[in-house]
Curated annotation (Swiss-Prot):
Residues 694-717 are annotated as: Disordered. CDD domains: DEXQc_DQX1, SF2_C_RHA. The lineage of its organism: Eukaryota, Metazoa, Chordata, Craniata, Vertebrata. ATP binds at residues 70-77. GO terms for molecular function: ATP binding; ATP hydrolysis activity; helicase activity; RNA binding. It is found in: Nucleus. Residues 248-447 form the Helicase C-terminal domain. This is ATP-dependent RNA helicase homolog DQX1. Its main location: nucleus. It comes from the Eukaryota. The keyword Nucleotide-binding applies. Residues 57-225 form the Helicase ATP-binding domain. PANTHER family: ATP-DEPENDENT RNA HELICASE, ATP-DEPENDENT RNA HELICASE DQX1. It comes from Homo sapiens (Human).
Length: 717
């Protein structure tokens, strides 16, 4: 027997004035007047016309897969999850909860807040969300919004299996690694432990629909009608401006002077430019002679945290939201009437050959450009100012966003695929197959970390590494700290390296710079991060204390939560802990050993004593980042001869970030012998081999001496 679609409140009969008679089927409480207000808004969305079609396809489709195709702003991300919850409720939630993935944690939280409001339910009870360091769910949660990378971690581990009745993969056109991987795993039918009657809903922009249709084998597609009304005609500049931030600011100020109605959405390539634009606009708008209140300038990027909800608040003043690719498809803002688009994005692209990230400034895709333009549609249509010529978009922009699985370090993904007992990650289906070189580099790195056994399967150590929500090399360093009795410090460091950057970018005032410099540690950036965290905790996690030192309060709070999660995980899998000893000479050496155990692939040597570092694994020369503690000292000493680094970024300056001095003897002692043998020919490799031979001779001599001492007493006896 097929279940019937759940009836909405107004289908039960009472009018809004009699709402006390209508009961919310999810919690058994009467609907509030707020529910009916929001229901009218929901029914006005373009997607509402497809409600019953979608529920019928979800119920009757034998393959269990439904595609939903619609433009940004059509209501896909808020309504599809609610309809899936109705479907699951009609079946008594016997197959599990409804889980909705989002490519960005901020989007998952924001949608959960909105959907809980529309459903007249309590956030954290029937509707919840799971994002890094924040699990706002409970035992009665029926609808959960989740960062897609967290869900991939759940799928790969033994935890959480069997919890999903409907799985919604939203914003598939974003092409995140986790979203593409989840689709590959589901399409390959490798999730045997999941419920057999699982429903999968893939929600996408129309531009990716043909590719998804072919990938899933022509499943039923629910097309969302286009929103009525005129679409703005883009206004193109003749040339690309030399200063994007200044051009965007002047365009916003011109709109404000004309006092055209509606909010403004500005797209810039990077968070740094977003901050500069917000600072400049906040100063300039105060001097405008306007009839009403000056515009409110709001940033929108991943580091905004909970402050992102300000973009949805009703204000008497005009809102100017400054963002980047984060808002291409997420965060629909109905009040937007004007869009200013730089046409560019700044992305990190990983090069597996040299194990480095490139900061690439590139054109957005045609799909993104169209999504940005549609933000300004309405009655009457708004405006879309493109800070680039039309030929730039036509000739240089790709049709779709680049798949991130072709641009990121795949070591963590391969580790998770191995956890799912997929012997050859290259055999897993992806919408776009990763480069063989990237997969080989990931396998090689995992092999160096002892995460794989002789057959190429996960070793016991690899299974433990896959449990941690950390990069494999950082998880290895954390496990090594158990051996070297520095777990407390390594927990702090792992959290600080994984959370958002704890330092705000200069310029700082002289007073702020002096206070920040006082937090630097002589042993290097890694110890400085530990010292910053401990000072933050001692301050009582005070936000004003952070602001006075140019520290990111939200990032430090995130690190504190993550540290607690890591500690709980180590206790659960019964790993040994150690007491705090930060600052002692022994702890300094132990911490270096733990770091080298995980990061021996990221070592560089100063070749000429001036700070030109040759990377050990390939012949690239880099300098220390300008934010490195070794460079920010007032009287810098000679650069450290050997350093371990966290990141190597190729941009304007090839730079090493988060750097600490190490002794090459530690590298010889702790790195796998075959790793040293595989290094490219260089003076650094020769020095390490000489050290290894000397240490081997010393060890042999020590053993010989010990044996002689043992034999002599035996003779005397």
């Amino acid at each position: 027997m097929t279940s019937q679609p759940l009836r909405l409140a107004e289908e039960y009969g009472p009018s809004p004035g009699e709402s006390e008679l209508a009961v919310n089927p999810f919690d058994g409480l009467p609907f509030s007047s707020r529910y009916y207000e929001l229901l009218k808004q929901r029914q006005a969305l373009p997607i509402w016309a497809a409600r019953f079609t979608f529920l019928e396809q979800l119920e009757s489709n034998p393959t269990g897969v439904v595609l939903v195709s619609g433009e940004p702003g059509s209501g896909k991300s808020t309504q599809i999850p609610q309809w899936c919850a109705e479907f699951a409720l009609a079946r008594g939630f016997q197959k599990g909860q409804v889980t909705v993935t989002q490519p960005y944690p901020l989007a998952a939280r924001s949608l959960a807040l909105r959907v809980a409001d529309e459903m007249d339910l309590t956030l954290g009870h029937e509707v919840g969300y799971s994002i890094p360091q924040e699990d706002c769910t409970g035992p009665n949660t029926l609808l959960r919004f989740c960062w897609d990378r967290l869900l991939l971690q759940e799928v790969a581990s033994t935890r959480g299996t069997g919890a999903w009745g409907v799985l919604v993969l939203d914003e598939a056109q974003e092409r995140s690694v986790a979203s593409d991987s989840l689709q590959g795993l589901l399409q390959d039918a490798r999730l045997e432990k999941l419920p057999g009657d699982l429903r999968v809903v893939v929600v996408t922009d129309p531009a990716l629909e043909p590719k998804l249709r072919a990938f899933w084998g022509n499943p039923p597609i629910v097309h969302i009608p286009r929103e009525p009304g005129e679409r703005p005609s883009p206004i193109y500049w003749d040339t690309i401006p030399p200063d994007r931030v200044e051009a965007a600011c002047q365009a916003v100020l011109e709109l404000c002077r004309k006092e055209l109605p509606g909010d403004v959405l500005v797209f810039l390539p990077s968070e740094e430019e977003i901050s500069l634009c917000c600072e400049s606009l906040s100063r300039e708008v105060e001097s405008l002679l306007l009839q009403g209140l000056p515009p409110r300038v709001l940033p929108l990027h991943p580091d905004c945290g909970r402050a992102v909800q300000a973009v949805y608040e009703d204000m008497d003043a005009r809102k100017v939201v400054v963002t980047h690719w984060l808002a291409d498809f997420s965060f629909s803002l109905p009040s937007i009437q004007h869009v200013i688009d730089s046409g560019l994005e700044l992305r990190s692209v990983y090069n597996p050959r040299i194990r480095a990230e490139f900061q690439v400034l590139r054109p957005i895709s045609k799909c993104q450009a169209e999504a940005r333009r549609l933000r300004a549609r309405g009655f009457p249509p708004g405006s879309c100012l493109c800070l680039y010529p039309k030929s730039f978009l036509e000739l240089e922009a790709p049709p779709l966003p680049q798949p991130r699985v072709c641009e990121e370090n795949l070591s963590s993904l391969v580790l998770l695929l191995k956890r799912r007992q997929i012997a050859e990650p290259g055999e897993c289906h992806f919408l776009d197959q990763p480069a063989p070189e990237a997969l080989m580099q990931a396998l090689e790195d995992l092999d160096y970390l002892a995460a794989l056994d002789d057959d190429g399967d996960l070793s016991d150590l690899g299974v433990i590494l896959s449990e941690f929500p950390l990069a494999p090399e950082l998880a290895k360093a954390l496990l090594a700290s158990c051996e070297f009795d520095c777990v407390d410090e390594m927990l702090t460091l792992a959290a600080m390296l994984t959370a958002a950057p704890g330092f705000t970018r200069p310029p700082l005032s002289a007073e702020e710079a002096a206070l920040r410099r006082a937090l630097e540690h002589t042993d290097g950036d890694h110890s400085s991060l530990i010292q910053v965290y401990e000072a933050f905790i001692q301050s009582g996690a005070d936000e004003a204390w952070c602001q006075a030192r140019g520290l990111n309060w939200a990032a430090l709070c995130q690190a504190h939560k993550l540290r607690g999660e890591l500690l709980e995980l180590m206790q659960r899998i019964e790993l040994p802990l150690s007491l705090p000893a930060f600052g002692s000479e022994q702890n300094r050496r132990d911490l270096q050993k733990a770091l080298v155990s995980g990061y021996f692939l990221k070592v560089a040597r100063d070749t000429d004593g001036t700070g030109n570092y040759l990377l050990l694994t390939h012949k690239h020369v880099a300098q220390l980042s300008s934010y490195c503690c070794y460079r920010s000292r007032r009287a810098p000493a000679r650069p450290p001869p050997w350093v371990l680094y966290h990141n190597f970024t190729i941009s304007k300056d090839n730079c090493l970030s988060i750097v600490s001095e190490i002794q090459p003897q530690m590298l010889v002692e702790l790195a796998p012998p075959y790793f040293l043998s595989n290094l490219p020919p260089s003076e650094s490799r020769d020095l390490l081999n000489q050290l290894r031979e000397g240490m081997a001779d010393s060890t042999a001599g020590s053993k010989s001496s010990s044996a002689q001492e043992f034999r002599d007493p035996c003779v005397l006896q």
